[in-house]
A protein has these predicted regions:
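Contiguous beta-strand/loop segments that form the cofactor/metal-binding neighborhood of enzyme cores
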Residues: 28-29, 41, 46-100, 104-238, ...
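Alpha/beta-hydrolase
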Residues: 15-18, 34, 45-47, 57
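Charged, alpha-helical scaffolding/interaction elements associated with membrane systems
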Residues: 10-11, 36, 227, 256
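Active-site Tyr-X1-5-Lys
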Residues: 7, 29-33
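Beta-strand-loop-alpha-helix segment that lines the small-molecule cofactor/substrate pocket
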Residues: 1-23, 37
């Protein structure tokens, strides 16, 4: 992502990333409410993805590359290994070489809105626990159950994900919450609402989703291209760069088993074990 970010800046390109919720009207309304200050001081934020529709990934033998597939191109810089359907379309996301599990798959969408709402870029430290608790013997490598805790110095963000369980926080399979001293704002792709703390503020009933955020996101991108106005992008390349880093931090903390600390000036962690996991290794002629 740093290479893409630097290339976009160097060549003056207009690049929009897929955080389309920034173009969804009810998400915009929720953030406007958050920024009104009615919730009071925010001390904790949560983001979560509970995926009950996802089951185990049974082990299957390696197989010949399907006709019409340029496997070398599909692999790109990833390590070369025999073709296996589990590592191909969709299920590739459960292997470290290609994807990074739910922590990044859903995390880049939901954590982005925590960062956006709270006006933050990176945490001071991260720690994480979890494992393959639901399907310990299947072919997935990434954890099916995980919690990561991010310290932003003046508030804490908690990420949770599970596979095989769908009843998440506030009875939502996915979402975000901003927990303030006066009340809590809960937000997902279906709508948002506010729960008051001891009647300090008025409750806000569910404000339902309207419009199509993905279409509006594409329209925003095209408008910026037509008018050469990169400053009006709802989610420029810097947005993707930032949230990809923060989501990956959760995985790095999980994989090292350490509480990790970030040095933003040096753009690296403070330990070699953590830095090793964000140092790219290119294969198949890529560099």
């Amino acid at each position: 992502i740093n290479i893409m970010y630097n290339a976009a800046r160097k060549h003056g390109k207009i690049v929009q990333v897929g955080q389309w919720q920034r173009s969804q009207p009810h998400f915009v309304d929720a953030i406007n409410y958050l920024k009104s200050g009615k919730l009071g001081r925010i001390r904790t934020c949560k983001a979560w993805s509970y995926v009950d529709w996802k089951g185990a990934v049974p082990k299957v033998p390696d197989a010949p590359v399907p006709a019409g597939v340029n496997y070398d191109m599909w692999l790109g810089p990833a390590p070369k290994r025999p073709f296996n359907m589990n590592r191909f379309h969709f299920t590739w996301r459960w292997y470290w070489e290609y994807g990074n599990g739910l922590m990044t798959d859903w995390g880049v969408h939901l954590i982005d809105y925590i960062l956006y709402g709270m006006g933050k870029s990176v945490p001071a430290s991260v720690m994480a626990i979890g494992g393959k608790y639901a399907f310990p013997d299947d072919d997935m490598v990434t954890p099916d159950t995980m919690t990561a805790v991010y310290d932003f110095s003046d508030f804490t963000m908690i990420w949770e994900h599970t596979i095989g369980i769908g009843l998440g926080n506030w009875k939502r399979p996915h979402g975000m919450s901003y927990i303030g001293e006066n009340g809590t704002l809960v937000l997902d792709r279906n709508g948002w609402e506010v729960f008051p703390e001891k009647q300090k503020i008025e409750a806000v009933p569910v404000q339902k989703n309207v419009g199509n955020g993905q279409d509006l996101h594409a329209r925003n991108f095209l408008d910026c291209l037509e008018n050469n106005t990169p400053e009006k992008l709802n989610a420029g390349i810097e947005v993707g760069r930032r949230v990809a880093l923060v989501a990956q931090m959760g995985n790095v903390a999980y994989r090292t088993g350490e509480k990790i600390y970030w040095d933003d000036a040096k753009q690296q962690f403070k330990t070699d074990t953590a830095n090793k996991l964000i140092t790219p290794v290119y294969n198949n002629g890529y560099n």
